[in-house]
Amino acid sequence: MITIVLMLPTAVYVHLRLPGIRRLMEGITILPIVIPPVVLIVGVLQIAPGPLKGTPYLLALEYVVLAMPFAYRAIDAGLRSLDLKTIVEASNSLGAGWARTLLRVLLPNLRTAVLAAVVLTVALVLGEYTMASLALYQTFPVWIYVNSQTSGQVSVAASLLALLVTWIFLMGITVLGTRQSRRTGGGSVTLFTVARQETRGN
């Protein structure tokens, strides 16, 4: 969730205000994939404030950095499919501010992209072992590995459960994406809703 909250406004702002640095942003966001997890966790431990060390919040921060490339690219792909500038200008002309435009206009149109980013992040966390083991936290992948040493059946069942949950999420995104593609004028409907609410407010 933290990854989505950070990446969605960032991607929208880059597309609207700073289109010239889109390639630079793509290069920056891909760094967590290039840098080995061991180097990443050691670097985070070096720069992290003292109160965060040894807490689950530090591991959450590391997962945010690790999931950033996948979340940003999923949202970026969704933004490329929209006439973003026209939608935002139309929303602003109806009196909607930046926050309202983002939450009430852009987010519904980016529902499939955001869900894809969520699923990719969840799948990454469910399969990430190195960071959690080095940080001495028993996350789901670490628990599976530890139990595989004593009970192979339990670890296999847990792995299948993780695959099943990920598959269900992916199927849900596919269904939502299919429904959204069949609709026409989805952005116009959202803008009409904003206009109607503004009219009522006046």
Where are these regions (language model features)?
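Membrane-water interface segments at the C-terminal ends of transmembrane alpha-helices
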Residues: M1-R80, N109-Y129, Q153-T178, T199-N202
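Short helix-to-coil transition segments within interhelical loops
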Residues: R17, E89-L110
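Short glycine/proline-centered loop/turn elements that form peptide/ligand docking sites
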Residues: L82-I87
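Ca2+-coordinating acidic residues in Ca2+-binding motifs
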Residues: E89, T139, S159
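Short functional hotspots where side chains directly engage DNA or cofactors
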Residues: L102, V146, S159
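Glycine-rich helix-loop "coupling/hinge" segments at transmembrane-helix boundaries
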Residues: V125-Q153, G186-F192
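Short cytosolic juxtamembrane segments of multi-pass membrane proteins
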Residues: G177-N202
